Amino acid sequence: MFSISVVITIGGLPGSGTTTMARRLAEHYGLKHVYAGKIFREMAEERGMDLEEFSKVAEDNPDIDLEIDRRQREAAEEGDVILEGRLAAFVAAGELDHVKGPDLATLKIWLKAPLEVRAERVAKREGIDVEEARRRIQEREKSELKRYKEIYGVDPTDLSLYDLVLDTSRWSEDETFSILKAAIDPLLEREDP
């Protein structure tokens, strides 16, 4: 399909637009979409728990995060994929002890937006009020930050690993998509990135 193996990572905090952009980009470029959040949600559902409950369980069970990472690294090694998740760039870059290896990423993207904007998006998506969405986001972020620091010794909000950081509150969904395509297209045209 492409002259290179394409591995694009998209990370961001809840409500920043990562899933929307990852889906659209995967469809546009004909890439697989491997989504850490979906894997995590499926694991929670299998145990009959909501995300908050399962996040608490995951704090004491690093095997949950390690399994998600292994699946993402395998997908990166296969190539032609968009990896979505807060640690996707770390996984693709081979930066974590249990997934050491060469940096497989073609492009590492971090999407961000202010908490209030993200809370409004999550509230709309999940059919809850904004205050509840804000509370859930803050709890989830606190839980994830704790897990990631304890399990991996990394701070997923350290943006130095990323090639592109974009505030999605400044543009519409279509404009954000266009900006990301403008960053990706030249990389896919090169024979040797």
From Swiss-Prot:
It is an enzyme of class 2 (transferase). It comes from the Archaea. Its main location: cytoplasm. The keyword Transferase applies. ATP binds at residues 12-20. It catalyses: CMP + ATP = CDP + ADP; dCMP + ATP = dCDP + ADP. HAMAP family: Cytidyl_kinase_type2. This is Cytidylate kinase. It comes from Methanopyrus kandleri (strain AV19 / DSM 6324 / JCM 9639 / NBRC 100938). The lineage of its organism: Archaea, Methanobacteriati, Methanobacteriota, Methanomada group, Methanopyri.
